[in-house]
């Protein structure tokens, strides 16, 4: 096994163990921003994961959600970590939340691990080697007709700048898609695209740690990931659309129809 993947799995699995240790405890829940929660489980899980990464790779850079580092990449090796993606779900005992660990090298994704805690599903990818779910190769779906497409999205609770055109888009998609879901954890949504459960995904107000791992998993599963302008510059832009090639193209077309261009541009 690729050494970086081996350590990423070790760190992510240790993070899952830390999360599970909090399930029988009373959580300390705080707001770090408008409608943006953090729990003591997030902090402890991040500490667990970063401890392993720093021990194994002391010279690597780290970008992690709860350390609030500036969202940038160096030309070297950077680990991008979300200790609990879906903190609000976790805080309310809604059983969809993930640990996400990614390695980017020279500003490109190289290794990705996402573990959905309650289902114990391990999604992994190494650049150029495909994507797997619990060790089995996965691929995006082959759906091409919108009326047969099953799509995921999100409704950012701390950014209402797009809510009006976003809901108009949502209403239109309700009429032409087979179904839309909002599980509340972008990493899980994206991984479900990678394994063919969902055919596409779109959302805004996402950060690098929300998409760094799962987007590589989608690409290695044969899918497409772009920003809302159809460009490859999506890691820090806070706008993402993904899917198999056909459904990605359809969602991108609808985004262009319903969201003004200035609101589709990356957020710097």
List each language-model region with its residue ranges.
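N-terminal subdomain of lithium-sensitive/metallo-dependent phosphomonoesterases centered on the IMPase/IPPase/PAP
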Residues: 1-84, 232, 246, 250-253, ...
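Oxyanion/phosphate-interacting regions
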Residues: 1-10, 168-175, 188-268
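Residue-level signal for inorganic ion chemistry
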Residues: 19, 42, 53, 87, ...
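Generic detector of well-ordered alpha-helical packing
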Residues: 43, 47, 66, 83-86, ...
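Residue-level detector of anion-binding/catalytic polar loops
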Residues: 59-61, 137, 179, 199, ...
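Glycine-rich active-site/cofactor-binding loop and its immediate structural neighborhood
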Residues: 77-119
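Acidic beta-strand-loop-alpha-helix segment within the catalytic core
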Residues: 102-190, 237-268
């Amino acid at each position: 096994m690729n050494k970086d993947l081996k350590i990423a799995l070790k760190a992510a699995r240790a993070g899952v163990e830390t999360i599970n240790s909090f399930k029988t405890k009373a959580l300390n829940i705080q707001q770090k921003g408008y409608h943006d929660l953090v729990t003591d489980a997030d902090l402890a899980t991040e500490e667990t994961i970063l401890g392993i990464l720093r021990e194994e790779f002391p010279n690597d850079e780290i970008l992690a959600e709860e350390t609030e580092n500036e969202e940038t990449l160096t030309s070297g090796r950077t680990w991008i970590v979300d200790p609990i993606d879906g903190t609000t779900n976790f805080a309310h005992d809604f059983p969809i939340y993930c640990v996400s660990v990614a390695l980017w090298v020279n500003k490109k994704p190289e290794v990705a691990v996402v573990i959905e805690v309650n289902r114990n599903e391990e999604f992994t990818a190494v650049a150029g080697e495909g994507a797997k779910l619990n060790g089995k190769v996965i691929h995006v779906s082959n759906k091409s007709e919108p009326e047969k497409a099953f799509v995921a999205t999100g409704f950012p609770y701390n950014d209402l700048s797009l809510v009006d055109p976003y809901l108009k888009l949502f209403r239109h998609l309700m009429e032409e898609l087979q179904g839309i879901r909002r599980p509340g954890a972008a990493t899980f949504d994206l991984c479900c695209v990678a394994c063919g459960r969902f055919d596409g995904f779109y959302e805004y107000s996402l950060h690098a740690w929300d998409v760094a791992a799962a987007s590589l998993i989608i690409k290695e599963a044969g899918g497409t990931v772009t920003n809302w302008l159809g460009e490859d510059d999506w890691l820090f832009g806070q706008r993402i659309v993904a899917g198999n090639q056909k459904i990605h193209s359809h969602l991108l077309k609808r985004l262009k129809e319903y969201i003004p261009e200035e609101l589709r541009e990356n957020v710097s």
